[in-house]
């Protein structure tokens, strides 16, 4: 498991606890928030890894770094499944190109690991339990049936009480159009910043 919200995020901790019902869970996640870092890898400085607990590791890098290190250095073997999340906030439309959460699942797929990202469509008052239980259902299905080659899933769960999560839809990736506003300010030394 990994994420882009950091090793201390409640989303990854709730998800790890839920996924433990399916087998051994390892977490290799950024040591701090790394949202919107896309699929970047750290190439020009060393990466530090801190073992937090038996199967929990914090990396001072990006989510894609975490997956790369997990597969090639930290874990004793290739995992059966890679799950990235639970992200605080949805990952839809063009935003997936910036998402560390989604990119981590993509990185897993590049290593030949079935993978999915899971995000909670909210900006506050997160209901992680329902999303975690849904992730367990998806994980169980993938472990049993696999995914098509070179395919990963990007799952977005509404932030509603679990009893309202009764069905799912498979959709196509849409577009999100954001404004291009840039806020210019001046620091105390008279220098512009954005």
Describe the role of every protein-language-model region.
Residues 109-131:
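Glycine-rich phosphate/pyrophosphate-binding loops
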Residues 104-108:
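Hydrophobic/aromatic ligand-binding patch that stacks against planar heteroaromatic rings
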Residues 130-194:
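Electrostatically charged, flexible surface regions
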Residues 90-99:
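Glycine/threonine-rich flexible loop motifs
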Residues 2, 28-30, 60, 84-87, ...:
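Short beta-strand segments
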Residues 1-19:
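N-terminal beta1-alpha1 ligand-phosphate binding loop
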Residues 81:
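Short, Asp-centered acidic motifs that coordinate Mg2+ and/or phosphate
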Residues 13-78:
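A cross-family phosphate/adenosyl-ligand binding-site feature
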